[in-house]
């Protein structure tokens, strides 16, 4: 059975992700107590169910300590994938304000006796980060701070299409002026490269458009940086695998996240697709949903 566990911070899009999996034919359960999960998996497997998605959040805090052991146990018999959704505190506060929903931990008792009840939304968010932090290392993290619901649904569908027998690498382009991604394991700054933005004909385009590709592809310094990053990844990927890492997010940043970082993320993704499962995501580039988050398939490989 394939089991997808969705966890992370409240307001980061867990319900959207769960709904996307339900549309994809998964048997979905929201806020399941972790200790019930093995029994549910056995029951559904006996009943012929082959796909299960479960959302787990801080309301299950009493059982969260059990999750690492449960994930290891389930992985012996099932294809288990963990998706950890995150977002900046500012983005979460804005979402809760817009929806007028109450945070699950608002009004709960703080772990610090001197603080007492968690009176503010920001306190509740930070407390939840502490509670679910141990689960982040088991899952593929994605920062939804700037991600719209339809883009998240598309990304989740791409995520479950990947084979689960090897390290999954996500190349994520972004713009430093919009903040660094929270989900990055490795980050490379490509702002030292010539910027197509200063060519007025290229300014409205992205690193996916042929004129921008031609501009950057003609520069030896661009290929030098790509070669250096690729060499670094090829050297260290075996060590990430040996460390039992299932997911690795490689963030590529330029000023606006529209030209250089997009081109380099695409180029590196195509190269590395020979050696790992690869997803590419463009966080800040003005591209359509399918282009902003997609698998790198055989046809993309040089």
UniProtKB/Swiss-Prot annotation:
List ligand-binding residues for ATP: 8-15
A Pfam match is RapZ-like_N
Presence of keyword GTP-binding: yes
**Could you cite one Gene Ontology molecular function of this protein?**
GTP binding
Domain of life per record: Bacteria
Which family, according to UniProt?
Belongs to the RapZ-like family.
Q: Which NCBIfam families match?
A: PRK05416.1
HAMAP family, per the entry:
RapZ_like
What is the recorded name of this protein? Answer: Nucleotide-binding protein Bcen2424_2795
Q: Which organism is it from?
A: Burkholderia cenocepacia (strain HI2424)
């Amino acid at each position: 059975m394939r089991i997808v566990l969705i966890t992370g911070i409240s307001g980061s899009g867990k319900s959207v992700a769960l709904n996307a999996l339900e549309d994809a034919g998964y048997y979905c359960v929201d806020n399941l107590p972790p200790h019930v999960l093995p029994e549910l998996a056995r029951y559904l497997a006996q009943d012929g169910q082959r796909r299960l998605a479960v959302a787990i959040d801080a309301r299950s805090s009493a059982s969260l300590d059990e999750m690492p052991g449960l994930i290891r146990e389930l992985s012996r018999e099932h294809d288990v994938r963990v998706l950890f959704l995150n977002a900046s505190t500012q983005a979460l506060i804005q979402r809760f304000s817009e929806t007028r929903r109450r945070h699950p931990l608002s009004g709960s008792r703080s772990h610090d006796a001197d603080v007492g009840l968690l009176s503010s939304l920001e306190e509740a968010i930070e407390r939840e980060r502490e509670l679910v932090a141990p689960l982040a290392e088991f899952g593929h993290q994605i920062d939804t701070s700037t991600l719209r619901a339809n883009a998240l649904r598309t990304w989740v569908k791409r995520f479950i299409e990947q084979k689960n027998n090897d390290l999954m690498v996500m190349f994520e382009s972004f713009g430093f002026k919009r903040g660094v991604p929270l989900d990055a394991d490795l980050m490379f700054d490509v702002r030292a490269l010539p910027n197509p933005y200063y060519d007025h004909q290229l300014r409205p385009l992205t690193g996916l458009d042929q004129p921008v590709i031609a501009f950057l592809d003609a520069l030896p310094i661009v290929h030098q940086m790509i070669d250096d990053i690729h060499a670094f990844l090829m050297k260290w990927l075996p060590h990430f695998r040996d460390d039992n890492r299932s997911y690795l997010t490689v963030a590529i940043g330029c000023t606006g996240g529209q030209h250089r970082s997009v081109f380099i993320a695409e180029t590196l993704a195509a190269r590395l697709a020979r050696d790992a499962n690869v997803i590419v995501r463009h966080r800040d580039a003005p591209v359509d949903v399918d282009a902003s988050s997609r698998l790198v398939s055989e046809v993309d490989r040089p």
